[in-house]
Design a protein with these regions (language model features):
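Hydrophobic residues in well-ordered beta-strands that form the structural core
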Residues: 127, 133, 152-154, 183
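Beta-loop-alpha module in the N-terminal Rossmann-like domain of NAD(P)-dependent dehydrogenases
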Residues: 80-144
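Contiguous beta-strand/loop segments that form the cofactor/metal-binding neighborhood of enzyme cores
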Residues: 1-25, 193, 200, 220-233
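Rossmann-fold dehydrogenase core element
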Residues: 140-158, 178-181
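N-terminal Rossmann-like dinucleotide-binding module
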Residues: 2-76
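Predominantly a Rossmann-like dinucleotide-binding segment in NAD(P)-dependent oxidoreductases
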Residues: 159-233
Length: 233
């Protein structure tokens, strides 16, 4: 009987699993990324790719019932589908098997207040961009991160794209000469028909300064353009 040929992804998976022998997976929880969240699905998928994380707890919606229902649909223990992030930080810190890392997938206006109680309990943070809604919050966040000596990672997803890495390599090697001018555009049209289209209305918080800070769309979307500029050059 012919031996089945393993695909490259399968071999890569096995290599990573071999590296993990004797190591426990990092227990991770999420705040945000609920039923209608595109980025929430992406983060949960990414956490499974290299088999190094175990998703065990979360808060997924401001609506308590919706949050619990969604959490259990993902296979979580009902006791670890929390009503709010503060309760989650408190309860997880009491568990011997509590979370070691937290993924934050909420509007930026909530990033600081969500991260703070977890950092104070020595939980490492993986947060969506932008860092915070205001500079003052960013400065305060930096201080507590340094005080508690945890890892705070800010996700900029486009830096993983192969074409961007190729562009970065070309520029670093000087193949196009000295870069004198950079023009970055990041067009999106989701606000068109925002009152009528359900998929658009889900994102209307980006136009609410109470949810994403005074910069609103400039920080939420503009941060992609700024990061692309800095990363590639």
């Amino acid at each position: 009987m012919a031996k089945k040929k393993k695909i490259a992804f399968g071999r890569l998976d096995l290599m990573r699993n071999d590296e993990l022998k004797g190591r426990s997976k990092i227990k991770i929880g999420f705040v945000g990324g609920g039923p209608n969240s595109f980025i929430g699905y992406s983060h949960r998928l990414a956490a499974r790719f290299d088999n190094r994380f175990e998703f065990v707890a979360g808060v997924f919606s401001r609506d308590i019932n919706k949050s619990r229902k969604f959490g259990t649909s993902l296979g979580l223990d009902t006791q670890r589908c929390y009503d709010d992030y503060f309760l989650m930080a408190k309860q997880e810190s009491k568990r011997t098997d509590g979370i070691e890392a937290l993924g934050i997938m909420t509007p930026s206006g909530d990033h600081y207040k969500i991260a703070k109680p977890f950092i104070e309990n020595k939980v490492h943070i993986i947060s969506d961009k932008p860092l915070t809604a205001t500079v003052d919050e960013a400065i305060k966040l930096e201080k507590i991160v340094k005080k508690h000596k945890i890892v705070f990672a800010l996700t900029h997803n486009y830096s993983a794209y192969p074409m961007l890495r190729e562009a970065k390599s070309i520029i670093e090697k000087g193949k196009i000469g000295k870069v004198m001018l950079i023009n970055v555009e990041y067009p999106q049209g989701y606000t068109v028909g925002i009152k009528k289209k359900e998929e658009a209305s889900i994102l209307k918080w980006r136009l609410d300064k109470n949810m994403c800070g005074p910069s609103m769309i400039l920080s939420e979307i503009g941060t992609h353009a700024y990061h692309l500029l800095r990363y590639v050059t």
